Amino acid sequence: MSAAMGRPFLKMNGLGNDFVVVETRSAPFEPTAAQVRAIADRATGIGCDQLIAVDPAEGADAHVRFWNADGEEVGACGNGTRCVGWLLMQSSGKDEAVIETRAGRLVATRAGERLVSVDMGPPRLEWNEIPLAEPHDTRALDVVLYHHADLMAPPGCVSMGNPHVVFFVPDAEQAPAAEAGPAIEGHPLFPEHVNVGFAQVKAPDRIRLRVWERGAGLTKACGTGACAAMVAASRRGLIGRHATMELDGGELFVEWRADGHVIMTGPAAVDFQGELP
């Protein structure tokens, strides 16, 4: 792994959704898909859900790139953005960090001790913005994606810079996430594949959520998934404009503001540091 050899990294997590974070100021970082998979491998590598590169940027605090554990570069990662935002604010001493991503510009702000809010921007709700392979109503998708009693109600589709489909289920703990997730992820309706959420509305301001993450599998938390589920539920009238999202790794607070922007608030943590092999 010569392109990465000896490069320092930080291992971070947001509610157990974990990342290997490298900064590229000292040397370019262009890992191959095989190198990403080797770093992410929990048996033989460092182990992570996503690899993150923090690049210098004109007019922003950083440009950030994300790779899923399968080696594919992706446009957005909510928990990862929150962790990078915390790092940038610690470095600058400021209470705000402007972050450029492939999916657009995001702004992180301090929300408390190791708590960070990220303005994820407005959700994309048109079928061709998700994207879907053909026109459908993204509020309630009229397609059976997986045959299971709990998954027959029409799911919602939202893009938060990456594609999500959200099923509303009677019991998130019993939802067939590990079985249905990989089958739906690669469904031909989703040309870029899709993240799959299983959401149980517990109260008008509380949702229990499990997420099968595209290219990573079941994760303890998915920030963009939490945003997508909250928006999908609000569009259906199941909740209002804000909710506490209960994920396997803990809680995120998500608000869909009147100006259309989605704000996600949650913790960021540093686990350890080291050097890439």
UniProtKB/Swiss-Prot annotation:
GO terms for molecular function: diaminopimelate epimerase activity. It catalyses: (2S,6S)-2,6-diaminopimelate = meso-2,6-diaminopimelate. Pathway: Amino-acid biosynthesis; L-lysine biosynthesis via DAP pathway; DL-2,6-diaminopimelate from LL-2,6-diaminopimelate: step 1/1. The active site is at residues 77, 222. It comes from the Bacteria. Pfam families: DAP_epimerase. This is Diaminopimelate epimerase. It comes from Phenylobacterium zucineum (strain HLK1).
